[in-house]
Amino acid sequence: MAEKIAVIGAGSWGTTLADLLAKKGHEVTLWAYEPELVLEMRDNRENSLFLPGIKLNERLAFTNDLAEAYRGCSMVLCVVPSQLVRRVMTNSLPFLPKEAIIVSASKGIEVDTLATVSEIYQEILPPEQFQVLAALSGPSFAREVALEMPTAVTAAASSEAVARRVQEAFTTDYFRVYRNSDVVGVELGGAIKNVIAIAAGISDGLGFGSNTRAALITRGLAEMTRLGVAMGAQPSTFAGLAGMGDLVLTCTGDLSRNRSVGIQIGQGRTLSEILGEMRMVAEGVKTTESAYNLAKKLGVEMPIIEQMYQMLYQNKSAREAVLELMTRNLKAEGV
């Protein structure tokens, strides 16, 4: 069935998904914070700031008015950076239709509270609306989806009916959506993989090889799984699209912003220099801090995350961090 969908956030991923949904025949309004971006997308059918070179579907509408975006919608897709979710969705509450399903595609952990995105929603939404929350995540570079390259992701919701409805709304012949009931696991996979991707980028920037990257991906997956289990997630989720799938993509793909940040750090640039030149958000930078503090709070051993925190926030050298990881006390593999 055709949905009336409000897409909140016009970065590369929000714009791509809005375009996909419009092409599928849904009635879609894309909300952007920047009035000038709304005007450009209306006039030129292109988001030159975040998704240059992609012609947007003629059915797609644009606004920077939250009330207009939400009017009469049956589904909401929120794709703002994770550190902005609380503010944007709190501002949205007066306009949010009570019957609308909410789909979260933000990947991160709130720095100030250590809350996952679904925990933020749980705090601000009425209980009945939180019951129809879903998380959409998986290995999906926006540009590849915009170019209709085959992609598979996961929609997680505690309600099977909600997961099915999201699955049906988003699935096309090039974008396949699988269902899952493990919202916590799907969210954590999407958040923690960004930190490991920065680590993989640092390894590449230092000139290390495929062995090193494979070790980081594998042990990063173990850390992600440990944290997830401590928070009530299912271990099997991390072997799926939202865990291993997204981790491999983000640690190896040339379109990965987080890996790019890491490569530049490995080559000797400072984090402040790198972030000062970026238009788009590299979620892994903030998530490094929140994941480090969350692991300490829960008593979960996450040595890669710990070394990443010391590199990004305490000026530890990358080579020193690598040496510490390689000379830790010897252990059985396991998780």
Curated annotation (Swiss-Prot):
GO molecular function terms noted in the UniProt entry: glycerol-3-phosphate dehydrogenase [NAD(P)+] activity; NAD binding
Residues noted as binding NADPH in the record, renumbered to the chain: S12, W13, K107, A142, R257, V281, E283
Active site: K193
Binding site for sn-glycerol 3-phosphate: K107, G138, S140, K193, D246, S256, R257, N258
Reaction catalyzed: sn-glycerol 3-phosphate + NAD(+) = dihydroxyacetone phosphate + NADH + H(+); sn-glycerol 3-phosphate + NADP(+) = dihydroxyacetone phosphate + NADPH + H(+)
Reported function: Catalyzes the reduction of the glycolytic intermediate dihydroxyacetone phosphate (DHAP) to sn-glycerol 3-phosphate (G3P), the key precursor for phospholipid synthesis.
Protein's name according to its UniProt entry: Glycerol-3-phosphate dehydrogenase [NAD(P)+]
Organism of origin: Citrifermentans bemidjiense (strain ATCC BAA-1014 / DSM 16622 / JCM 12645 / Bem) (Geobacter bemidjiensis)
Lineage, broadest ranks: Bacteria, Pseudomonadati, Thermodesulfobacteriota, Desulfuromonadia, Geobacterales
